[in-house]
Amino acid sequence: MEAPAPSLTEEDLTEVKKDALENLRVYLCEKIIAERHFDHLRAKKILSREDTEEISCRTSSRKRAGKLLDYLQENPKGLDTLVESIRREKTQNFLIQKITDEVLKLRNIKLEHLKGLKCSSCEPFAAGATNNLSRSNSDESNFSEKQRPSTVIYHPEGESSTAPFFSTESSLNLPVLEVGRLENSSFSSASLPRPGDPGAPPLPPDLRLEEGGSCGNSSEMFLPLRSRALSRQ
């Protein structure tokens, strides 16, 4: 679908007519007789009485025409009203063709300029939209990359494990591990041979002497009890 052709606003048309009068100033100053157009321009409120008196003060016809063009350039309808006045006079219709050609030429130049501005403004927009899309994709990928390592922590040894809020399984297994450790410790303590049992390692000499002394003393302590019991019998 093609974009609509650009159109000129009232402000653009006013500028085009003003430029046309400026471009044709030298030519119109030689051809126009200002006094012939006073009545029509005053009737259309383009000129006032003071304006016509100001124009008439000029010493030559060319200067009076130049001053008239100055007033016409200040009014958006000045050129159109001048063309109407020339058409009413019916003596300088060639001026109408000259003015019309100049206005059309400047109008086309203005349209081409606006068309070029519109095309140039569309291209950066499309490129900017592509850049924004790629930038958003890169931002999303960067965000996902940042989110990925946030759930992993590293131990000093370099081993990785899940973050605390993902360690429910390990916390649930803690009691089982503790029970296993207790069972293993009790089993190991029960299975070890006691001193003096078969398979137990020999005691050091110092401990042997102490054990022997304690046994001798204990037998001596029980001897009187046995003798008393035997004497009573």
Curated annotation (Swiss-Prot):
Q: What is its main location?
A: cytoplasm
Question: What GO cellular component entries does it have?
Answer: CBM complex; cytoplasm; cytoplasmic microtubule; cytosol; immunological synapse; lysosome; membrane raft; nucleoplasm
**Where along the sequence does the record put site: Cleavage?**
R228, A229
Q: Domain of life here?
A: Eukaryota
Per the record, where are the segments of Pro residues compositional bias?
Answer: 195-205
Site of covalent link Glycyl lysine isopeptide (Lys-Gly) (interchain with G-Cter in ubiquitin): K17, K31, K63
Q: Which GO terms describe its molecular function?
A: CARD domain binding; general transcription initiation factor binding; identical protein binding; kinase activator activity; NF-kappaB binding; protease binding; protein kinase B binding; protein-containing complex binding
Q: Which UniProt keywords apply?
A: Acetylation, Adaptive immunity, Apoptosis, Cytoplasm, Immunity, Innate immunity, Isopeptide bond, Membrane, Phosphoprotein, Tumor suppressor, Ubl conjugation
Start and end of every CARD domain? 13-101
> What positions are modified (N-acetylmethionine)?
M1
Q: Which residues cross the membrane?
A: none
**Modifications made to the protein after synthesis:** Phosphorylated. Phosphorylation results in dissociation from TRAF2 and binding to BIRC2/c-IAP2. Phosphorylated by IKBKB/IKKB. Ubiquitinated via both 'Lys-63'-linked and linear ('Met-1'-linked) polyubiquitin chains in response to T-cell receptor (TCR) activation. Ubiquitination is recognized by IKBKG/NEMO, the regulatory subunit of I-kappa-B kinase (IKK), and is required for TCR-induced NF-kappa-B activation. Linear ubiquitination at Lys-17, Lys-31 and Lys-63 is mediated by RNF31/HOIP; linear ubiquitination is recognized with much higher affinity than 'Lys-63'-linked ubiquitin by IKBKG/NEMO. CARD11 is required for linear ubiquitination by HOIP by promoting the targeting of BCL10 to RNF31/HOIP.
Q: Where is the composition biased (Polar residues)?
A: 130-141
Modified-residue entries (Phosphoserine), positions: S138
Q: Name one GO biological process term.
A: positive regulation of apoptotic process
Q: How does it assemble?
A: Homomultimer; homooligomerized following recruitment by CARD domain-containing proteins that form a nucleating helical template that recruits BCL10 via CARD-CARD interaction. Self-associates by CARD-CARD interaction and interacts with other CARD-proteins such as CARD9, CARD10, CARD11 and CARD14. Forms a complex with CARD14 and MALT1; resulting in the formation of a CBM (CARD14-BCL10-MALT1) complex. Forms a complex with CARD11 and MALT1; resulting in the formation of a CBM (CARD11-BCL10-MALT1) complex.
The name under which this protein is listed is B-cell lymphoma/leukemia 10
Q: What organism does the record attribute this protein to?
A: Rattus norvegicus (Rat)
